[in-house]
């Protein structure tokens, strides 16, 4: 099939207007409007003007029909819109605009220097006038850490968006301006949803590693998230000025631990406190930073003698690694020729965008060294919006997969990826994948088909806003006045498209909570509603049995932050109970059942009989209900009631009242009564059969096992291992570095409560740890017995009341 052309479609470049330019545009519009009115009133000029106007609108209609034809062809056969076809056939003006846009995120392990690096990026691009440190003495804090809590604790809690322009010289020495949409993300696993939703809408990422620690636990998590959303990345080895810095250890760990081909594109000139700059391996030039804040770059062909041999060796390793992932370089390599600088650069770009390779840069953000070359790498090696494949599902065509085209003239498709409460109401962050989002326009929410107006569009600079009139394809913005949920798709109504949302992990820890003062009930409810809306991993439930409100999250720190925010932002002090683990229940073995529910009470009674079996599914994933009725002994509507009863039973297990995992129920026979059978009767019969069969199946209580990583100075290794053994942890691996060691272990969440204070005591405050949910496994028999007895006592006490 012939590839449909996208050329010649009219295009409107994205409006990144400042307030002054917006006012000027408005004045020009009024001037043109007055002039056009005068023309229309003129008897001699009106016909000519009307003819031109008619021709203009005809061109617009033709463009729209062409765009519609392109979409129609793509919907019928998505392969017609390959990324190559999109890039080749874009209108030159539109292609030029998109080629200068980069949507990137910065992600890494805790304290690898993400926010510090972002601060330098903003300074070197001219977005901010002065550098402020994360834990600076000036009490200002980094620009992207806008929350008071972030500045006090020195950590990033929520992702923050900004935009800036970076000027880079092309091959001919001409300066080209590139537009960057940048999102800084947290490093703590407790705030992993912030990383998830950022990577869901970004085209590329900078993965930062510590030059001393290399690949750490959260680096592996970030790598998994990048793979989930097919996000190309470049790597930046930060903290080259730290004692024990070894960037090539980090490169080796990317290859071995993350299993992605990687090679250095720079080598350091000096290290630790003698780190001076880097050597660019493509151009074989030494690069140094000068000026009070490293704002001036100095390049020279004179590479220091002490690193010449290393630079030659690493350049050859770069070419060899590329030969394994890129056909063009492989051919050159086999012919024993030397690729040119441009050939290497293009190969790195191809391999990076195709997720086959990551180039590794190095520097020190805190020391203001070698950040600008990393920015050049963002431009050179990360994709623009037209080079990334973004898919939507067409609900009008049985959810057929359709490629989205980052073209301003096509119908609008956008994804709401983050909600935030502000002084002006709900702020919704949207990535526009296709078409143009305009102020005052109407859009449709694909989830509920609601039509909403866009009253205001802003571009975010951390907690500051800049109003704009429109945002084009490939851009990120925020809008006010749009009620929606995180992950909702918006269209202009012409398309039935919906996009997949981001992955949301299940909470692993809960707390009972209530306001200390009953007068704070209204503010307490407002806070709970807002926090749930903003953060999908923060859950609020009400336990009818204990009559308690429970909040659930990703860890102790996660819930502590929300309790502190409630106190500061809503002036509500809360009482909390002890942490509660998200236990699960599961079936032990296959059990058959034949249950009859029969009640007579004078009038219509209840009658339902269900026959079948329950068995483990083989994995602790979703529960399965299956009907194998032959001969219609149970009608379809009663089977729906049986399925409902099964899922209700799985939501609250018979052992300790927690959710059930890995259970399958099959109903293959039953009986009904002409007058006494009902949907309610079959639902209740199924629940009763479930409870009885479950208890006969040798069931078990499951507890969450956490993947735990502890890092501390080497002299405390024995104390740390003893601390973990005391908590029944299974130690899987350990690494001993120059000054510190790392222990990798699996430990039950129940055993990890309160470890922070004990670890600080054991390591004189120098140890740190991270936890991430790994899997569920059977709890120890004594713990199962205690939990079941406690639950049964609570049930008995409740019935006495």
Swiss-Prot record:
GO terms for molecular function: GTP binding; GTPase activity; translation elongation factor activity. NCBIfam families: EF-G, PRK12740.1-5, small_GTP. Residues 1-62 form a transit peptide. Pfam families: EFG_C (PF00679), EFG_III (PF14492), EFG_IV (PF03764), GTP_EFTU (PF00009), GTP_EFTU_D2 (PF03144). GTP binds at residues 108-115, 184-188, 238-241. Mitochondrial GTPase that catalyzes the GTP-dependent ribosomal translocation step during translation elongation. During this step, the ribosome changes from the pre-translocational (PRE) to the post-translocational (POST) state as the newly formed A-site-bound peptidyl-tRNA and P-site-bound deacylated tRNA move to the P and E sites, respectively. Catalyzes the coordinated movement of the two tRNA molecules, the mRNA and conformational changes in the ribosome. SUPFAM superfamilies: EF-G C-terminal domain-like, P-loop containing nucleoside triphosphate hydrolases, Ribosomal protein S5 domain 2-like, Translation proteins. GO terms for biological process: mitochondrial translational elongation. Its main location: mitochondrion. Residues 99-386 form the tr-type G domain. Pathway: Protein biosynthesis; polypeptide chain elongation. CDD domains: EF-G, EFG_III, EFG_mtEFG1_IV, mtEFG1_II_like. It is found in: Mitochondrion. Keywords: Elongation factor, GTP-binding, Mitochondrion, Nucleotide-binding, Protein biosynthesis, Transit peptide. It comes from the Eukaryota. This is Elongation factor G, mitochondrial. It comes from Aspergillus niger (strain ATCC MYA-4892 / CBS 513.88 / FGSC A1513). GO terms for cellular component: mitochondrion.
């Amino acid at each position: 099939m012939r590839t449909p052309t996208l050329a010649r479609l009219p295009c409107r470049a994205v409006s990144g207007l400042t307030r002054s330019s917006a006012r000027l545009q408005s004045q020009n519009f009024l001037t043109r409007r007055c002039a056009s009115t005068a023309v229309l009133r003129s008897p001699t000029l009106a016909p000519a003007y009307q003819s031109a106007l008619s021709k203009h609108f005809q061109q617009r209609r033709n463009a729209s029909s062409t765009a519609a034809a392109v979409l129609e062809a793509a919907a019928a056969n998505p392969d017609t819109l390959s990324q190559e076809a999109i890039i080749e056939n874009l209108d030159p003006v539109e292609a030029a605009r998109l080629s200068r846009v980069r949507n990137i995120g910065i992600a890494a392990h805790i304290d690898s220097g993400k926010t510090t690096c972002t601060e330098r990026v903003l300074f070197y691009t001219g977005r901010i006038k002065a550098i402020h440190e994360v834990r600076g003495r000036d009490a200002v804090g980094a620009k992207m850490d806008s929350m008071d809590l972030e500045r006090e604790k020195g950590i990033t809690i929520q992702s923050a968006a900004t935009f800036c322009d970076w000027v880079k010289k092309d091959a001919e020495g001409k300066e080209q301006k590139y537009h960057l949409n940048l999102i800084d993300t947290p490093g703590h696993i407790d705030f992993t949803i912030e990383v998830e939703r950022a990577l869901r809408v970004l085209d590329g990422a900078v993965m930062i590693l510590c030059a001393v620690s290399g690949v750490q636990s959260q680096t592996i998590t970030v790598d998994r998230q990048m793979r989930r959303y097919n996000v190309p990345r470049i790597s930046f080895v930060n903290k080259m000025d730290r004692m024990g810095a070894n960037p090539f250890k980090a490169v080796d760990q990317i290859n071995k631990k993350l299993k992605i081909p990687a090679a250095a594109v720079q080598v350091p000139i000096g290290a630790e406190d003698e780190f001076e700059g880097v050597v660019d391996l493509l151009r074989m030039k030494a690069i140094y930073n000068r000026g009070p804040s490293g704002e001036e770059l100095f390049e020279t062909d004179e590479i220091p003698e002490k690193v010449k041999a290393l630079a030659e060796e690493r350049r050859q390793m770069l070419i060899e690694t590329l030969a394994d992932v890129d056909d063009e370089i492989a051919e050159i390599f086999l012919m024993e020729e030397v690729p040119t600088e441009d050939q290497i650069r293009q190969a790195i770009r191809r391999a990076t965008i195709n997720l086959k390779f990551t180039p590794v840069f190095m520097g020190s953000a805190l020391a203001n060294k070698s950040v600008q070359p990393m920015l050049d790498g963002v431009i050179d090696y990360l994709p623009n919006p037209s080079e990334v494949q973004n898919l939507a599902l067409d609900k009008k065509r049985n959810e057929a997969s359709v490629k989205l085209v980052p073209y301003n003239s096509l119908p609008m498709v956008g994804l709401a990826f983050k909600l935030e409460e502000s002084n002006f109401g709900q702020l919704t962050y949207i990535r526009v994948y296709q078409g143009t989002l305009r102020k005052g326009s109407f859009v449709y929410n694909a989830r509920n088909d609601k039509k909403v107006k866009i009253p205001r569009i802003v571009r975010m600079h951390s907690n500051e806003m800049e109003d704009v009139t429109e945002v084009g394809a490939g851009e990120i913005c925020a809008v006010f006045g749009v009620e929606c949920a995180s992950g909702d798709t918006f269209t202009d109504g012409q398309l039935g498209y919906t996009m997949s949302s981001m992955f949301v992990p299940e909470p692993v820890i809960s707390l009972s909570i209530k306001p200390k003062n009953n007068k704070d009930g209204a503010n307490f409810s407002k806070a709970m509603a807002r926090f749930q809306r903003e953060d999908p991993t923060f859950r609020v439930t009400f336990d009818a049995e204990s009559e308690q409100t429970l909040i659930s999250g990703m860890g102790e720190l996660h819930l502590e932050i929300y309790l502190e925010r409630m106190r500061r932002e809503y002036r509500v002090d809360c009482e909390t109970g002890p942490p509660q683990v998200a236990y699960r229940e599961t079936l032990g073995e296959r059990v058959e059942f034949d249950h009859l529910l029969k009640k007579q009470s004078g009038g219509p009674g209840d009658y339902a009989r269900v026959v079948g079996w329950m068995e483990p599914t083989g994995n602790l994933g979703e529960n399965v209900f299956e009907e194998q009725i032959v001969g219609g002994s149970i009608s379809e509507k009663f089977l729906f009631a049986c399925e409902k009863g099964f899922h209700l039973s799985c939501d609250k297990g018979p052992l300790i009242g927690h959710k059930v995992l890995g259970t399958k129920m099959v109903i293959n026979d039953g009986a009904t009564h002409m007058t006494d059978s009902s949907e309610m009767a079959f639902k209740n019969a199924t629940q009763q059969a479930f409870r009885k069969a479950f208890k006969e199946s040798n069931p078990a209580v499951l507890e969450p096992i956490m993947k735990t990583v502890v890092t501390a100075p080497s002299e405390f290794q024995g104390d740390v291992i003893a601390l973990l053994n005391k908590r029944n942890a299974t130690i899987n691996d350990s690494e001993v570095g120059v000054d510190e060691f790392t222990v990798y272990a699996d430990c039950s969440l129940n055993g990890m409560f309160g470890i922070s204070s004990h670890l600080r005591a054991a390591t004189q405050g120098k140890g740190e740890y991270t936890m991430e949910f790994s899997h569920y496994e059977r709890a120890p028999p004594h713990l199962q017995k205690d939990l079941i007895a406690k639950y049964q006592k609570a049930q008995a006490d409740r019935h006495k009341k």
